[in-house]
């Protein structure tokens, strides 16, 4: 019996990287999965490979949220789980970053997740319960040079998580956040970021001295989506190899 048997899940940003790992693990654990992205070629390929259902989904669009949620409920009759995984990173120092770039990061990472929570309330109420997992970051706890917009969005997502947890508990909807650290994905390996960071020194500063595989985050996400996390809401789960334990000296 899988951890997520009988669950219907909607996962954003699911075409590659950590999102694709979530899609694969949720399927392995028995969930039926609809996943969205704006990367159509990769999304369609993953759907063909796994049997999950792909939908083009710009998370900044309320209309596209309505469409994605409707697809899941029309196909499977309910919606139990939302994983707000979609996110973008732009490495720019404050004096180099345009207002448009700042707005884009906040729009995808913060507003997109808020729209997602708003969009799933009614179907989760109808189902009698639900679970939302917001993918934040260790940058939701600390600042980093060149990541002002990204850090702001991830700090903000912590606040949305806690507010939503308080609002939605009466409907048996749990809301938690996951905070990955150094994960081996295309976004983390962004050339602008990699060129600014000495990877060897960075790894030496870790307690667990390696980058994580995306599926190592997915296992935490799946737990929070499952009934085994029935008493967890408004909580923050770090998957960071000990990066936030201290300064490393």
Describe the role of every protein-language-model region.
Residues 3-34:
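Canonical Rossmann dinucleotide-binding motif of NAD(H)/NADP(H)-dependent dehydrogenases/reductases
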Residues 93-94, 101-106, 202:
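Substrate-binding pocket helix/loop in short-chain dehydrogenase/reductase
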Residues 117, 153, 161:
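Active-site helix of classical SDR
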Residues 122, 166-170, 230:
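Alpha-helical segment proximal to the catalytic Tyr-Lys
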Residues 137:
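Residue(s) in the substrate-gating loop at a strand-loop-helix junction
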Residues 142, 222, 233-249:
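Short C-terminal tail/terminal secondary-structure segment
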Residues 170, 182-205, 246-249:
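A glycine/serine/threonine-rich, flexible loop-to-helix segment
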């Amino acid at each position: 019996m899988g951890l997520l048997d009988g669950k219907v899940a909607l996962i954003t940003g699911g075409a590659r990287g950590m999102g694709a790992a979530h899609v694969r693990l949720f399927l392995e654990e028995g969930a039926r999965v609809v996943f969205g992205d704006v990367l159509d070629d990769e999304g369609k390929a993953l759907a063909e490979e796994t049997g999950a259902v792909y939908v083009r989904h710009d998370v900044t669009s309320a209309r596209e949220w309505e469409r994605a949620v409707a697809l899941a409920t029309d196909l499977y009759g309910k919606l139990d789980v939302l994983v707000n995984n979609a996110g973008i990173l732009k490495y720019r120092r404050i004096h180099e970053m345009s207002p448009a770039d700042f707005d884009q990061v906040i729009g995808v990472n913060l507003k997109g997740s808020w729209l997602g929570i708003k969009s799933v309330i009614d179907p989760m109420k109808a189902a009698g319960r639900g679970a939302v997992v917001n993918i934040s970051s260790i940058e939701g706890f600390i600042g980093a040079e060149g990541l002002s917009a990204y850090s702001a969005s991830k700090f903000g997502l912590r606040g949305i998580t806690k507010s939503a947890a308080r609002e939605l508990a009466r409907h048996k909807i749990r809301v938690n956040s996951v905070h990955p650290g150094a994960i081996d994905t295309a976004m983390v390996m962004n050339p602008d970021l990699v060129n600014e960071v000495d990877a060897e020194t960075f790894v030496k500063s870790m307690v667990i001295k390696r980058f994580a595989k995306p599926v190592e985050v997915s296992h935490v996400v799946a737990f929070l989506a499952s009934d085994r996390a029935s008493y967890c809401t408004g909580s923050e789960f770090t998957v960071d190899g000990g990066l936030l334990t201290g300064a490393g000296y």
